[in-house]
Amino acid sequence: MSANGAVWGRVRSRLRAFPERLAVCGAEAAAYGRCVQASTAPGGRLSKDFCAREFEALRSCFAAAAKKTLEGGC
Amino acid sequence: MLRPAGLWRLCRLSWAARVPAENLGRRDVTSGVSPRGSTSPRTLNIFDRDLKRKQKNWAAQQPEPTKFDYLKEEVGSRIADRVYDIPRNFPLALDLGCGRGYIAQYLNKETIGKFFQADIAENALKNSLETEIPTVSVLADEEFLPFRENTFDLVVSSLSLHWVNDLPRALEQIHYILKPDGVFIGAMFGGDTLYELRCSLQLAETEREGGFSPHISPFTAVNDLGHLLGRAGFNTLTVDTDEIQVNYPGMFELMEDLQGMGESNCSWNRKALLHRDTMLAAAAVYREMYRNEDGSVPATYQIYYMIGWKYHESQARPAERGSATVSFGELGKINNLMPQGNKSQ
């Protein structure tokens, strides 16, 4: 960590905003979670990008929520 | 750093010869780092003890230290209950990996005469909680205890043994420093702890990155615990398990609390980076797979409590083979047998 911890502090504050942005994207998160959970059923195999579509939807919703809060405040 | 390292190795080799205390104290300078060419072939080096000390120091000097104490307070009070269950007083006791002294605050002067608090993090010892028992703070690593044989009547350890590298050796040392008829009461995290977090991270990392690396440290299984205690020389073992479930708003809050408790990962094979995408995916999976009705997510902490005694002639021993006077077949007539005072063990 640097002397005044500026970078660490900045990264941490960005991370602290994650939960509220995730709360905004509840539906997309649930869809992604269901897709991953389905792969854990007997006979399913989880491979890379198995649920890529759902994750893209979640990520774009998350980015939109981030932009909204950025424009909204701080 | 050559001279202290050489002295330290000398101290380790003459362990059996009871090296005087002032030389043993020097161990702390190089403690936490296992020598590469170690004397014992079974020495494991899973955790970076130096990093664990830094993490605990950081956790102990946070602005609100009590915010993350809830789990350790709870387990500390349950260990104090077990100490009270034993109808004895302990003139000299040791708390290994005490943190801020969560057990001492629940015990009283009559039960414990003098309490030694040992931890690897000096900030934790500096901010220790109030207790009426006279205490001595010692900066010591759980694997390299600077105490003589047959010193303590009671050794307690709450939620710190899951970070030691060589658990068999740590238990053997605890057995060594106990007096005959002394008791060791410990609590450590068990196999199912944080399984929700482990599974979520595993699934998310596999889906996002194609493979996964361990983020939760490996825990001891309950069978192994019994064997380890037996191998260390303890008698009359008792191991029982308890599950504490804590609800969090989400995965990020859980991880923040774990860091605040000083329980961040410090294994050598940890991945240095956890991608934001993976964290996001894991939080989504955690919420979907494990959430409660009210929207919170649970985290399970499985605690194993163990009690072991150091051998003394006065302790009860199993009866001799063939000395039974009553057979199990007569169990139905136990009412007739009992007034005679003729109970078989």
Curated annotation (Swiss-Prot), chain B:
Subunit composition and interactions: Interacts with NDUFAF8, leading to stabilize NDUFAF5. Interacts with NDUFS7. Interacts with PYURF (via TRM112 domain); the interaction is direct and stabilizes NDUFAF5 protein.
Gene it is expressed from: NDUFAF5
Cell compartment(s), UniProt: Mitochondrion inner membrane
Protein name, per record: Arginine-hydroxylase NDUFAF5, mitochondrial
Disulfide feature: none
InterPro entries: Malonyl-ACP_OMT, Methyltransf_11, SAM-dependent_MTases_sf
GO cellular component: matrix side of mitochondrial inner membrane; mitochondrion
Function (record text): Arginine hydroxylase that mediates hydroxylation of 'Arg-111' of NDUFS7 and is involved in the assembly of mitochondrial NADH:ubiquinone oxidoreductase complex (complex I, MT-ND1) at early stages. May also have methyltransferase activity.
Transit peptide feature, positions: 1-36
The keyword Chloroplast belongs to this UniProt entry's keyword annotation: no
EC numbers, comma separated: 1.-.-.-, 2.1.1.-
GO biological process: methylation; mitochondrial respiratory chain complex I assembly
Protein family (similarity comment): Belongs to the methyltransferase superfamily.
Superkingdom as given in the UniProt entry: Eukaryota
Transmembrane segments: none
MF terms in GO: monooxygenase activity; S-adenosylmethionine-dependent methyltransferase activity
Keywords, in A-Z order: Membrane, Methyltransferase, Mitochondrion, Mitochondrion inner membrane, Oxidoreductase, Transferase, Transit peptide
Species this protein is from: Pongo abelii (Sumatran orangutan)
